[in-house]
Amino acid sequence: MNNNGNALSRTALTPTNNKVISGDLVTNGLPPIDNNIICSNGFMPINVTRKNPFRKRTTQEFIREWTEWKENSPSLFTAPIVGVVTSTLLEALKKQVQSRLLLLMTNLLFPNNSTSTMEEILRATEQYVQEQLDTVTWNRVSQELEGLKNNLRTFNDQIDDFLQNRVEISPTAMIDSINTMQQVFVNRLPQFQLSDYQLLLLPLFAQGATLHLTFIRDIIINAGEWNIPEAQLNTCKRYLKQYVAQYSNYALSTYEGAFRARFYPRATLENMLQFKTFMTLNVLDLVSIWSLLKYMNLYISTSANLYNIGDNKVNEGEYSISYWPFFNSYIQTKSNYVLSGVSGYAIRWYYLNTFFGEYIQDNLYNIIASYVGGVNGPKIGVQLSTTELDKQIKQQARAGMPTGLDDLSFNCTLRNPTTVPYFACNFQELTSSGTAGTGGFIRSDVFRSEDNICGLGTGYASAWTSYPDYYITNISATVQVDGINIDITPLCFGEDRAITSTHGVNKVIAVYNRKANIAGTNQNGTMIHQAPNDGTGFTVSPLHLASFTHPSEAHIQENYGNSGDSLRLTGPTTAITYMLSGDGRTIYKLVLRVSGVITRITAKVRGNSIGYLEYINTVDNNQGITDNGSKFQDFEFRPTITIDAQTPIVLEFSATSNFDLMNLIFIPYYDTPIY
């Protein structure tokens, strides 16, 4: 018998198996009933493997992928166009020539000269936040969308006319068109910032701001072809920096204020994670791109995380909002390693009710994620060993309450964690009397890769949660509340701090990230970053390090608009190593995005210094953006570097106060940032 959650036949008070390798999909006698449909069982997303992350992709591909995702994800409140826009922007930034990004964005957001797609974003937000615009405001916003659409069409038509008949349109006429469109954006965007509806309108604002920023960027990139005078070009460069900061600060402060307002003083972690995921897809992903629009040939390799969390309601509990910073870092434990599997200790208990008959209750006592290199994450749930748990279960069984039990423990291992990762999961609690009996509940905590389905209750996994271009990079969980105070002092980066509960695991959590350019792993299991082979620049998350000298002096600092969180360093000196792999042909410049006051940064490649930066102070010298307290600036090392196979990049820091390492950016040596 396979006891990984598929077989419901029971044994008389004796577990049939203490550890089962579960990977097959088997049906069983009790019909699975899906109470939380997220994806149809037959839907297989395109991005199920990490293969060829640098291939060129078309907008049509993104439209197809996100449309199929939405068709198979009816319970999610996100319009597919927001994913299409983000994916298209990321693809456009990879290309050396994307001359008219505004035209592409206009056609996506106003297809067939209609505002219906933008209105769909607003309706989806209304559904999620459970608020609605009043009729007057809705009509006002609709009119603003109509006006914006018409002005964008007029401007794009004027550019077409100029390019086709350049002798008939003077540079003065071009400048007049640009100034008119600029004034439209300045006047229209405040209509998506109405004081009573700031959160509700924020996704629309994010799309409008993206249109404005790509408009300015197009002018700068095409200044020569469009005969833009140098004075006007310099004005546009100033505008791009100004509005990136202005729009970023508004979006970030609105998100932060809404998060605190919704979840103060206490809330469930499920609600917090769902809000973070919704806002990342609809707003924060775009914000993270805005400050990188100044680079013209860049592959953004990481993203903020998305999440899926179980819908279990037993002993759910609420947490103080002060718990969130700890929890945000906890679910990213081992984020610099490559996930290789997950295991858990689970028991299915059978009980008999005199009036309603037999019912089932599943208990997941603990769960542990595993990573390449033989590395394990912290044990979440009951901290007893397997032997001790077996003894406890037998004692409980002999007490006479249950009529039987099955051991549903699982031990899942990916065949090839680097290229064939988990891409989807199914977390649900089945409470139908026809499935679990009256008063019963059955768990389904299942993970899916291209060639494997594994976890607790695989026979009930009729629904899957996935996101185009995202992979499951970590697995965590919440515990059932039992009165034990959880230690929420800041986690050191990579710290294995157990989360204890005598009642076991409540909700399993899957963490999704876009990270795809993984060349392999180091001997310790940490990831090696693959550089593009076509001369494109790329980014590296500061959290994806290979090693560092003072782990107790590093923490995860949450950032909302930074393609992921930062590494906060608190010691006077530290050295961090990142391992990269490339073909050795592209010459790069290294740019560091940092926040704080730093005495000195020295960069070494293959053990040789390539230069240093001294006396950095982003309190005074920054890009004008405040991201959860971080004011940042990009600093470039002048010497160039090449990246061969297994190239270590070592960063040595000296500082007298805390500072944040927010991003590593490798740009082709011939590219100059816009500002």
From Swiss-Prot:
Keywords: Sporulation, Toxin, Virulence. One of its GO terms (molecular function) is toxin activity. It holds the Pfam family Endotoxin_N. The keyword Repeat does not apply. GO terms for biological process: sporulation resulting in formation of a cellular spore; symbiont-mediated killing of host cell. Binds to the brush border membrane vesicles of scarab larvae and damages the gut wall somehow to allow the vegetative cells of P.popilliae to enter the hemolymph. Belongs to the delta endotoxin family. This is Parasporal crystal protein Cry18Ba. It comes from Paenibacillus popilliae. The lineage of its organism: Bacteria, Bacillati, Bacillota, Bacilli, Bacillales.
